[in-house]
């Protein structure tokens, strides 16, 4: 898993509440268990006007040249609701997103994001409203996210966000569940030598 310490990128505003995982990555594309290749299907039903995904919907924001290289997604409340498919996070990461800023996330989506180096940031509705106003006034605006200091830098302003210290540590060191287990493998093996034989059966 890649490390997340600091990132500066273009903000892509998705001004919609309750964006569910079927919108993020429709079910017909969930045929792989590898994490690559889902980016081209991100927001498929919004990005394309045909079922084959060959004709772009020019009204959708990711098809705007200003935003096509965006890496920070700005959203409303309950982002990532719906089914628990981790493919939704894979699609966002594969497209190039590094962080999502929203009023709230579904619990499972939030957890899946942390396990894939996608930083989910929650801010108050009032702050999210301000950020949307800034983005609309300054299309293609860059902002910076600093995980070390828990700060978002937007032009001359800065906003603080909260994150669990354990999740922060894992993101900054690029550790997923497997990495964490391997980190303590020697202790696990030592503990297993202490288990009585009758408990091993």
UniProtKB/Swiss-Prot annotation:
Single GO molecular function: 3-isopropylmalate dehydratase activity
Entry keyword annotation includes Amino-acid biosynthesis: yes
Xref: InterPro entries: 3-IsopropMal_deHydase_ssu, Aconitase/3IPM_dehydase_swvl, AconitaseA/IPMdHydase_ssu_swvl, IPMI_Swivel, LeuD
Keywords: Amino-acid biosynthesis, Branched-chain amino acid biosynthesis, Leucine biosynthesis, Lyase
EC number(s) stated in the UniProt entry for this protein: 4.2.1.33
A GO term from the CC aspect: 3-isopropylmalate dehydratase complex
Principal EC category: lyase
Pathway listed: Amino-acid biosynthesis; L-leucine biosynthesis; L-leucine from 3-methyl-2-oxobutanoate: step 2/4
GO biological process, one term: L-leucine biosynthetic process
Catalyzed reactions per annotation: (2R,3S)-3-isopropylmalate = (2S)-2-isopropylmalate
Family: Belongs to the LeuD family. LeuD type 1 subfamily.
Assembly: Heterodimer of LeuC and LeuD.
Protein task: Catalyzes the isomerization between 2-isopropylmalate and 3-isopropylmalate, via the formation of 2-isopropylmaleate.
Descriptive protein name: 3-isopropylmalate dehydratase small subunit
Organism of provenance: Buchnera aphidicola subsp. Baizongia pistaciae (strain Bp)
Classification lineage: Bacteria, Pseudomonadati, Pseudomonadota, Gammaproteobacteria, Enterobacterales
């Amino acid at each position: 898993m890649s490390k997340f310490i600091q990132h500066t990128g273009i903000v892509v505003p998705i001004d919609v509440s309750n964006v569910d995982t079927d919108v993020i990555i429709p079910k017909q594309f969930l045929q792989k268990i590898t994490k690559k290749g889902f980016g081209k299907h991100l927001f498929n039903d919004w990005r394309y006007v045909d079922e084959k995904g060959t004709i772009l919907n020019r009204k959708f924001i990711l098809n705007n040249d200003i935003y096509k290289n965006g890496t920070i997604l700005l959203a409303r409340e309950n982002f990532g609701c719906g089914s628990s498919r981790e493919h939704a996070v894979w699609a966002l990461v594969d497209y190039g997103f590094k962080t999502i800023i929203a009023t709230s996330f579904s619990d499972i989506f939030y957890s899946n994001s942390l396990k894939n180096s996608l930083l989910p940031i929650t801010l108050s509705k009032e702050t999210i409203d301000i950020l949307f106003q800034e983005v609309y006034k300054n299309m293609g605006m860059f902002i910076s996210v600093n995980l070390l200091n828990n700060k978002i830098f937007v032009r001359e302003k800065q906003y603080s966000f909260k994150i669990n210290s354990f999740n922060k540590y894992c993101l900054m060191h690029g550790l997923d569940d497997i990495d964490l287990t391997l980190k303590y493998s020697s202790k696990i093996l030592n503990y297993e030598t202490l288990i009585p034989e009758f408990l091993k059966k």
